[in-house]
């Protein structure tokens, strides 16, 4: 009988384990909520749905303090710290009145429930669509409720001529249900690019598409699940999407330049027969392609910002999810009976480690933004500091949780402090760089020369590089030795090589490592449209070099001729000595000495006169 019963017992055990695992997964996704409609039972959320409360006193609760106490009463196993009205609405079925069990006809009600927040407050990650902007408003002196924060976000977007896409609370106050800031996403009411702007007739080639019909760039922006599983981590997904975006922009700009050069060639031919008409056509051509160029320029900037914002959102979402999981593990370890020191220490250090990763990512992103777009970096510097302060506050709250059990705190706190000491110097150096004020670059004067052919002037007019591009002094970048901890297997990506590579590509003056020069132009388009100017400058430099070389050679020849002529005219100096044949007789030597003294032999003189 024993062997026949054992398989059935194993099936029951495995089934119970499966049910327990399913309940654990569902509890991870479960978020406590309550909803109220006056004269109807209060509803609270459970993993299986919504459950009514027959207590009439809880039917019409409105004050945040009362709602917080109600949440703590309904969910005693959760650490409820605050309440927040949801930014979305939910439909609750079968919401009947008191003493009514079924009301199918009029039982569905759509309300905005209240979220019972568990653990430390964390602001939501907002999606930033294309051509939209993300901003925030924070006044620590004022604490507002949900509706007032909503009005603040709408007024801020309305002041920009935009509409509010979404918003979320930024920082909680001491009073439940009140917050001292709001973050929001504003979107334009109309399209960014005017419809009247003419674009090239033929569209640029389409990048290669994935198996589901989307290219890497589009799939990345849409968050396609199949695309997400194609790459190992977020860094690879971002680089693949960026590569496709840059390819698309290059092909689009190259096509525009080809069309423009073809139109310029037609104007040159027209100039031979009708110069006046050619001038008019050239002016019209310049204005038209100037609009196209600036439209493409703005579109490229918007696409790059959208890609970077999506990348930041993915990373922040990963970090927030990881924090939530580790926070729940820490809470479970603290509430365990009896609490285990090893689990508490492991959960606390893991959570602090993720928070420190969030810090390092924020530092790296801000430094990259400061190198590529100083103006945008200056605009978000205050928000970056607030984000870092929020991280520090959450870490302090986790450490305060340990104080609930002094014995456990005494055992695990030294190891946690030792672990946090690894990041102390890193945070200090990073904060020093973050608060560093960038000096204003000195602008150097730009000398321009008027070209004889108006087509080259039109090129500068279209691209806007004739007067807008102002070279600045290249200065060595003040690099500080910041030792960053190694990225372990839990890390989603190591962004530092990507940031360095992106900085080099984005800044046209980054030719050598350690130098920064800000140039006020769109590098990719401006480099392509200035090919004619580069060729003209190269030709002029070649002619000038040949002329200078010819003059130098001519001077060398003249000097050589003069020196040679002077040398041939130089007389031989004997200094009173005459070379005498060593084999001569003493008489011949005596005669030679007499001749050297001025004596002339009469016999020789006689014969010389006879020969003449």
Swiss-Prot record:
Annotated GO MF terms: heparin binding; transition metal ion binding
Comp. bias regions, Basic and acidic residues: 439-453, 470-483
Major place of residence: membrane
Subcellular location: Cell membrane; Cell projection, Axon
Keyword Signal: yes
Cysteines paired by S-S bonds: 38-60, 71-116, 96-103, 132-187, 143-173, 157-186
Pfam families, alphabetized: APP_amyloid, APP_Cu_bd, APP_E2, APP_N
SMART domains: A4_EXTRA
GO biological process: axonogenesis; central nervous system development
Renumbered residue ranges of the record's region Disordered: 251-276, 437-490
InterPro entries recorded: Amyloid_Cu-bd_sf, Amyloid_glyco, Amyloid_glyco_Cu-bd, Amyloid_glyco_E2_domain, Amyloid_glyco_extra, Amyloid_glyco_heparin-bd, Amyloid_glyco_heparin-bd_sf, Amyloid_glyco_intracell_CS
Subunit structure: Interacts (via cytoplasmic domain) with kinesin heavy chain.
Known role: Acts as a kinesin I membrane receptor, thereby playing a role in axonal anterograde transport of cargo towards synapses in axons.
Listed name of the protein: Amyloid-beta precursor-like protein
């Amino acid at each position: 009988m024993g062997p026949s019963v054992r398989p059935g017992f194993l099936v029951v055990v495995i089934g119970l384990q499966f049910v327990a695992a399913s309940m654990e997964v569902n509890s991870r996704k479960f978020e406590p909520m309550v909803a109220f409609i006056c004269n109807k039972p209060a509803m609270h959320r459970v993993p299986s749905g919504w459950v009514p409360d027959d207590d009439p006193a809880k039917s019409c609760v409105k004050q945040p303090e009362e709602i917080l106490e109600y949440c703590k009463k309904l969910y005693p196993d959760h650490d409820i710290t605050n309440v927040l009205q949801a930014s979305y609405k939910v439909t609750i079925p079968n919401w009947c009145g008191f003493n009514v069990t079924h009301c199918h006809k009029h039982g569905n009600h759509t309300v905005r429930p209240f979220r019972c927040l568990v653990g430390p407050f964390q602001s939501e990650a907002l999606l930033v669509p294309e051509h939209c902007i993300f901003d925030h408003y924070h006044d620590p002196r004022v604490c507002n409720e949900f509706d007032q924060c909503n009005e603040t976000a709408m007024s801020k977007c309305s002041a920009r001529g935009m509409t509010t896409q979404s918003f979320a609370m930024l920082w909680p106050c001491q009073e439940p249900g009140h917050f001292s800031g709001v973050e929001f996403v504003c979107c334009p009411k109309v399209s960014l690019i005017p419809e009247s702007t003419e674009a090239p007739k033929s569209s640029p080639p389409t990048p290669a598409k994935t198996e589901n019909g989307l290219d890497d760039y589009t799939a990345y922006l849409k968050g396609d699940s199949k695309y997400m599983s194609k790459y190992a981590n977020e860094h690879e997904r971002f680089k693949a999407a960026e590569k496709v975006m840059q390819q698309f922009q290059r092909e689009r700009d190259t096509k525009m330049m080809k069309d423009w050069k073809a139109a310029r060639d037609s104007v040159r031919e027209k100039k031979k027969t009708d110069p006046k008409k050619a001038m008019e056509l050239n002016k019209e051509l310049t204005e038209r392609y100037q609009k196209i160029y600036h439209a493409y320029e703005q579109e490229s900037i918007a696409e790059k910002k959208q890609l970077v914002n999506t990348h930041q959102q993915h990373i922040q979402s990963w970090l927030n999810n990881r924090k939530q999981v580790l926070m729940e593990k820490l809470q479970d370890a603290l509430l365990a009976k009896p609490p285990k020191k090893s689990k508490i220490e492991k959960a606390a250090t893991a959570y602090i480690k993720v928070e420190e990763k969030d810090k390092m990512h924020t530092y790296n992103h801000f430094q990259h933004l400061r190198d590529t777009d100083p103006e945008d970096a200056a605009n978000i510097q205050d928000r970056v500091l607030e984000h870092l302060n929020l991280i520090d506050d959450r870490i302090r709250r986790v450490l305060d949780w340990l104080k609930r059990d002094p014995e456990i705190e005494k055992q695990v706190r030294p190891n946690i402090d030792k672990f946090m000491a690894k990041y102390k110097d890193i945070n200090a150096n990073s904060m020093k760089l973050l608060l560093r004020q960038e000096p204003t670059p000195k602008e150097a004067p730009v000398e321009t020369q008027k070209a004889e052919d108006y087509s080259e002037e039109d090129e500068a007019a279209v691209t806007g590089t004739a007067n807008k591009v102002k070279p600045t002094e290249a200065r060595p970048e003040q690099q500080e030795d910041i030792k960053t901890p190694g990225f372990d297997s839990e890390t989603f990506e190591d962004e530092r090589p990507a940031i360095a590579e992106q900085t080099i590509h984005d800044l046209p003056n980054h030719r050598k490592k350690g130098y920064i020069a800000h140039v006020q132009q769109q590098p990719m388009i401006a480099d392509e449209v200035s090919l004619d100017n580069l060729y003209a400058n190269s030709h002029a430099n070649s002619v000038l070099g040949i002329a200078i070389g010819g003059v130098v050679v001519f001077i060398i020849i003249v000097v050589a001729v003069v020196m040679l002529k002077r040398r041939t005219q130089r007389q031989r100096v004997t200094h009173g000595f005459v070379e005498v044949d060593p084999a001569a007789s003493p008489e011949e030597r005596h005669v030679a000495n007499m001749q050297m003294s001025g004596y002339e032999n009469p016999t020789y003189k006689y014969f010389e006169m006879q020969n003449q």
